[in-house]
């Protein structure tokens, strides 16, 4: 099993690489790439951790050497949010970065499962799909927008609010990965009920949690460590699916034939081909149905931005 992390010298990439070095199955290969010259050194640093995961680092303009033979590619490359920015402000820089990297993925490891972390995810995933279509290698079951951070935040905040063991909290988060497009389905959480006020405030906190971190870091960065953990959870689920483990389910932003938009975050069953099955997200409350329907114009606009960027 070979996993490649593109953007491995950044805050998310280093956290993700550390977690993968400690969690990937014995005998796996972990390949780190970043434009920054420090990247081979990050790999040397991590190589001193005593786990049976072989690690190599690559720097420079071309990620191809890192991608050869990759089964899973996780892309966190790009610029981070600063105070006063929202995820869409990142588009002007990150769109080009994702396009260029995906062109190399399409040429080097077109069958790999690709997880896009780089924001704005609503748009960068659409860019990746269009690039792969142009290259003639697009497989909608192998491309994912990583929305796991919205899920782990939801699990954490619900457990805190209700005094639950966080390991027992399961929730679907649907829609997209920014602002109003993030929709935690609180009505489905087993064993708890929420007042209307709690639903409104908790939904808003989950939607704005990224901004909470950006502001708390006071210009010193965005959510890198929690995102690294979320990306590792999702990446490990991709690996477990590839290894044939049963019932591996995660929410992800995918081209899953949703009635709502071309790309939509919902639960998917993972397996040897990436997505084995897109799962229904179940019954929703009136509040959730309204929130879902009112986000769609925003979500579709984000997607169109990505499609138009490549065309």
From Swiss-Prot:
Task: Give the matching Pfam families.
Answer: Ldh_1_C, Ldh_1_N
Top-level taxon of the source organism: Bacteria
- Name the residues annotated as catalytic in the UniProt entry: 177
Q: Which CDD domains match?
A: MDH_glyoxysomal_mitochondrial
The residues listed in the UniProt record as binding NAD(+), with positions renumbered to this chain, are 7-13, 34, 94, 117-119, 227
Q: Name one GO molecular function term.
A: L-malate dehydrogenase (NAD+) activity
Query: Which protein family is it in?
Result: Belongs to the LDH/MDH superfamily. MDH type 1 family.
Q: What is this protein called?
A: Malate dehydrogenase
């Amino acid at each position: 099993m070979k996993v490649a992390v593109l953007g491995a010298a950044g805050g998310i990439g280093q956290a993700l690489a550390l977690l993968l070095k400690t969690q990937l199955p014995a005998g796996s290969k972990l390949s780190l790439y970043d434009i920054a010259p420090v990247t081979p050194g990050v790999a040397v640093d991590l190589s001193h951790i005593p786990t049976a995961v072989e690690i190599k680092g690559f720097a420079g303009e071309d990620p191809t050497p890192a991608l050869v033979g990759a089964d899973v590619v996780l892309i966190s490359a790009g610029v981070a949010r600063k105070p006063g920015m929202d995820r869409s402000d990142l588009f002007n820089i990150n769109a080009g970065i994702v396009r260029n990297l995906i062109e190399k993925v399409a040429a080097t490891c077109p069958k790999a499962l690709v997880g896009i972390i780089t924001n704005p995810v609503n748009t960068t995933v659409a860019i990746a799909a269009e690039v792969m279509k142009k290259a003639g290698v697009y497989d909608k079951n192998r491309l994912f927008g990583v929305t796991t951070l919205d899920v782990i935040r939801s699990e954490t905040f619900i457990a805190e609010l209700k005094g639950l063991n966080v390991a027992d909290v399961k929730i679907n988060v649907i829609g997209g990965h920014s602002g109003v497009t993030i929709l935690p389905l609180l009505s489905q959480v087993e064993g708890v009920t929420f007042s209307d006020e709690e639903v409104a405030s908790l939904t808003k906190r989950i939607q704005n949690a990224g901004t909470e971190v950006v502001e708390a870091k006071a210009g010193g960065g965005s959510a890198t460590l929690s995102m690294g953990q979320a990306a590792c959870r999702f990446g490990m689920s991709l690996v477990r699916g590839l290894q044939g483990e049963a019932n591996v389910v995660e929410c992800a932003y995918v081209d899953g034939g949703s009635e709502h938009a071309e790309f939509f975050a919902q639960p998917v069953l993972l397996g040897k081909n990436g997505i084995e099955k897109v799962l229904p997200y179940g019954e929703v409350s009136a509040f959730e149905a309204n929130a879902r329907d009112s986000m769609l114009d925003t979500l579709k606009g984000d997607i169109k931005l990505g499609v138009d960027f490549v065309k």
